[in-house]
């Protein structure tokens, strides 16, 4: 679907749903939010993941201004609930009302209710962190409301192009995604005036003191969700091949990925479904030598940043934003094949065996990765840029 078609589809939907939205706006005068706010943050849920972690980081950055957080999607695990709750801000979880296809009209009515809250708020600022409901709300907001979109993946491009004209700032977490937007704008004949609204802000991570790890074994770590894009079954195949051949190579899996692991890997690797304790998770990072990812698509996972900050070597498929930060044989190792799973498996095995046999290279790449993290993942720059957006 091109830009013009997306806009036509959007306008038809807005016309059809107008009576329900209008009803919601009327109800919004009687249904009051639990807290008056000038900042409204739309997030899908508090599930574990890189994107929700960034959302929580932004919430904590703004907590003194008491933003209102709206969750719209049924959570899978709510693993970051405590992280969001610890900001001591008002959170309205609407998923039981608006994430149900059997009474979708309530979803539409709430667009009117919430937009009326926002439109009545002086100097309102609205941000959507990969949240579909954000796009449903913004056509109903006054032009004076500042609207900010945060994206980490290019999987949203076809959907959100219909809402380009409503968004004042389109923020991505990698330069690659900005390039994706620019290509889309050109191919779909999006007016050039909207290009100036694109920019990226690198996420930040803590840079802990460097700990040199000396051991005869080599520990390979995977951290992530059990999502299809992660292709954990490939990592399982790599792990089984390496562990059967060399007992000194060990694997640790963190995430809800048991169903993707072979019986051999489940029996012989370390497996932890969830690690909510941040210190325990960081201990696992420190104990590892390598982070292995074989994703089909990614933005820049926070775990990559965390591992680079610790001087660990990232071995990953060269997808999307990752090559902007991982330079092969300098700051990490890239698997250039991204489609043929057998070749990905073979390359992954070869690269890990190479690092096992060449500890000097492992050490050298790890130090270069840490230097890159120090340069790019700066907390002060992150905070200054986001505070400026919400000013």
Located regions from the model:
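A conserved mid-protein helix/loop that constitutes part of the nucleotide-sugar donor-binding site
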Residues: 50-57, 227-241
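A short, active-site helix/loop in glycosyltransferases that binds the activated sugar's phosphate group
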Residues: 137, 157-160, 168-196
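Short hydrophobic beta-strand element within catalytic cores of glycosyltransferases
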Residues: 313-316, 326
């Amino acid at each position: 679907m091109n830009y013009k078609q997306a806009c036509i589809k959007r306008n038809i939907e807005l016309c059809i749903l107008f009576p329900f939205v209008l009803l919601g706006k009327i109800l919004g005068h009687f249904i009051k939010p639990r807290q008056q706010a000038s900042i409204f943050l739309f997030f899908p849920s508090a599930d574990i993941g890189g994107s929700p972690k960034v959302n929580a980081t932004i919430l904590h950055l703004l907590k003194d201004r008491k933003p209102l957080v709206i969750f719209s999607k049924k959570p899978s695990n709510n693993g970051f609930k405590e992280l969001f709750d610890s900001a001591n801000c008002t959170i309205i979880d609407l998923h039981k009302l608006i994430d149900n296809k059997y009474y979708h009209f309530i979803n539409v009515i709430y667009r009117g209710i919430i937009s009326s809250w926002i439109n009545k708020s002086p100097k309102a600022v609205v941000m959507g962190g990969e949240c579909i409901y954000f796009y449903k709300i913004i056509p109903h907001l006054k032009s004076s409301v500042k609207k900010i979109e945060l994206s980490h993946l290019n999987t949203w491009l076809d959907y959100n192009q219909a809402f380009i004209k409503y968004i004042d700032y389109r923020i991505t977490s990698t330069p690659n995604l900005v390039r994706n937007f620019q290509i889309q704008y050109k191919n779909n004949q999006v007016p050039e005036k909207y290009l100036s609204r694109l920019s990226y802000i690198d996420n930040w991570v803590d840079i802990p003191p460097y700990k040199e790890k000396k051991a005869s074994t080599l520990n390979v770590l995977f951290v992530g969700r059990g999502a299809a894009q992660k292709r954990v079954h490939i990592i399982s195949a790599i792990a089984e091949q390496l562990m059967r051949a060399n007992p000194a190579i060990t694997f640790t899996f963190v995430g809800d990925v048991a169903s993707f692991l072979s019986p051999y890997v489940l029996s012989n690797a370390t497996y932890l479904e969830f690690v909510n304790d941040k210190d325990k998770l960081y201990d696992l990072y420190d104990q590892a030598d390598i982070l292995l990812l074989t994703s089909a698509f990614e933005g820049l996972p926070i775990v990559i940043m965390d591992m680079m900050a610790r001087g660990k070597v990232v071995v990953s498929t060269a997808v999307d934003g990752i090559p902007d930060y991982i330079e092969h044989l300098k700051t990490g190792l890239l698997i250039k094949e991204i489609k043929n799973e057998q070749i990905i498996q073979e390359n992954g095995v070869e690269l890990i065996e190479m690092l096992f046999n060449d500890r000097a290279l492992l050490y050298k790449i790890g130090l270069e990765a840490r230097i890159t993290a120090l340069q790019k993942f700066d907390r002060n720059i992150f905070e200054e840029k986001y505070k400026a957006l919400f000013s």
